[in-house]
Structure formats: structure tokens, C-alpha cells
UniProtKB/Swiss-Prot annotation:
Protein name (database record): ProSAAS
Biological source species: Rattus norvegicus (Rat)
Gene: Pcsk1n
GO biological process: neuropeptide signaling pathway; peptide hormone processing; response to cold; response to dietary excess
Region annotation C-terminal inhibitory domain: where it falls in the sequence: 221-260
Annotated transmembrane regions: none
Length: 260
């Protein structure tokens, strides 16, 4: 309480007066604290008047004590209110001081960020409140930005290790586009009869080429290739087998006898 602004500022008179009133009410009046002096009374005096005068005296003592207790409670509430106001004023002053400190730190950071190079002549510190650095510092304070976060934004962060790794080379697979697809579609089709013939050879597993009949297209190719020269013996044998297959009639299917 010694360094309180309420005791040293313009409110010191009101607080001092409340403290004095509180001390005065806590101290009992001398009429209540002094012991009453017993007056000598005669033996012939009656005891009834004494009983009548004792009751108002007891009431008079009880009434000031109740008023004093109520006044003490009022003063205690007023003193608590003043102490709460003092605490709020102190917290407000501390917040203002912290805001001023942040403003000074931001101004120094901005001044260091925009400082000229070593070759340039040094400039005098700018304390103008309308300077760009001060205006930016006030704007940042209004936005409640952290000075540490601002410093982290001003200093460039190191590049991650993943960005420094070399990328694999990109190989050119040739031109792509609709023209290439059209060119791929122009490939010659395979004869389905030849495919069926080859598939039958693979499934039967026969090693002799004469085991299965050749397709008609192959027979025509053999007939067209025959010229005035004498064909070899294996070609003549193949032609004879083909002719026998063409002349032979298909066998009738056997009839199944049904039971009577």
C-alpha cells in the first residue's frame, strides 16, 4: 500500500478519510468503555426504580453497537471497491507498458530490416511517430501479431531436404497424341482362320505338320505357288491328302435305337 497510486495520487484524500473513519468507529466511545461509578444508596431506597432505569441503559448500549457494525461493513465494502479499482488500474498500466515494449521491438526489427548496406552512410535514428516503420508497428500491434512470428517471417527459412534431392531424368517416349493412336490402329489384322489353326495345333500337341488339315487359304497359296517346275514330293503328298478329304462324303450319324 505504500507505493499505491491511490495513497499518492488525487484519490489519496478519500482513502485516508475512509481509513480514519474506520479507525474511529472501531474504537469504542469513552462513555461505553468506562466503568460506571456506583453511587451510595440508603437502605431505605427502593429497588424498583433501579430496575426501571437499567433497561433503557442496556438498550442505549445495544443501538450504537449495531450502527457501528453496519458502518464498519459499509467502509469495508468501499475499501474493497477501491482496492479492486487500484488492481485494475495497475493491470491496465502493465498492459500499456507491454504494448509499448512490443512497439519498440517491432520498430527496431523494421528499422534493421530496412537498414542500408554497409557501404552506404549511416542514417540517424528516426523517432518520428509518422514514419513508415512506426506506422507499420502500430498497425501490427492493432492486429495483435507476435514479434517472434514476425521475425520468423522476415528471416528466410531453410529449404527442406526433399527439395534438394536430384530428380530422376525424364525420358522421351516419342510423340504422343491422336495421330500416334491412328497410326497404331493401322496395323494389319491377323487372319482368324490362321489363328484357329495354330490354336488347334497347340491344343492337340501334334508335332507332325501333316496331322491336321491346312486351312483353305494356305491350300490356295500352295496352288498358286506351283509353277511349271515339278513340285517336291511332300507338296504332292499334301495335295493328294487334301483332295481325298474334299471327295470323301460325310458319314451319316448313327441312329440310336429307342427301347420299345
Amino acid at each position: 500500500m505504500a507505493g499505491s497510486p491511490l495513497l499518492c495520487g488525487p484519490r489519496a484524500g478519500g482513502v485516508g478519510l475512509l481509513v480514519l473513519l474506520l479507525l474511529g468507529l472501531l474504537r469504542l466511545p469513552p462513555t461505553l468503555s468506562a466503568r460506571p461509578v456506583k453511587e451510595p444508596r440508603s437502605l431505605s431506597a427502593a429497588s424498583a426504580p433501579l430496575a426501571e432505569t437499567s433497561t433503557p441503559l442496556r438498550l442505549r448500549r445495544a443501538v450504537p453497537r449495531g450502527e457501528a457494525a453496519g458502518a464498519v461493513q459499509e467502509l469495508a465494502r468501499a475499501l474493497a471497491h477501491l482496492l479492486e479499482a487500484e488492481r485494475q488500474e495497475r493491470a491496465r498500466a502493465e498492459a500499456q507498458e507491454a504494448e509499448d515494449q512490443q512497439a519498440r521491438v517491432l520498430a527496431q526489427l523494421l528499422r534493421a530490416w530496412g537498414s542500408p548496406r554497409a557501404s552506404d552512410p549511416p542514417l540517424a535514428p528516426d523517432d518520428d511517430p509518422d514514419a513508415p516503420a512506426a506506422q507499420l508497428a502500430r498497425a501490427l500491434l492493432r492486429a495483435r501479431l507476435d514479434p517472434a512470428a514476425l521475425a520468423a517471417q522476415l528471416v528466410p527459412a531453410p529449404a527442406p531436404a526433399a527439395a534438394l534431392r536430384p530428380r530422376p531424368p525424364v525420358y522421351d517416349d516419342g510423340p504422343t497424341g491422336p495421330d500416334v493412336e491412328d497410326a497404331a490402329d493401322e496395323t494389319p489384322d491377323v487372319d482368324p482362320e490362321l489363328l484357329r489353326y495354330l490354336l488347334g495345333r497347340i491344343l492337340t500337341g501334334s508335332s507332325e505338320p501333316e496331322a491336321a488339315p491346312a486351312p483353305r487359304r494356305l491350300r490356295r497359296a500352295v496352288d498358286q505357288d506351283l509353277g511349271p517346275e515339278v513340285p517336291p514330293e511332300n507338296v504332292l503328298g499334301a495335295l493328294l491328302r487334301v483332295k481325298r478329304l474334299e471327295n470323301s462324303s460325310p458319314q451319316a450319324p448313327a441312329r440310336r435305337l429307342l427301347p420299345p
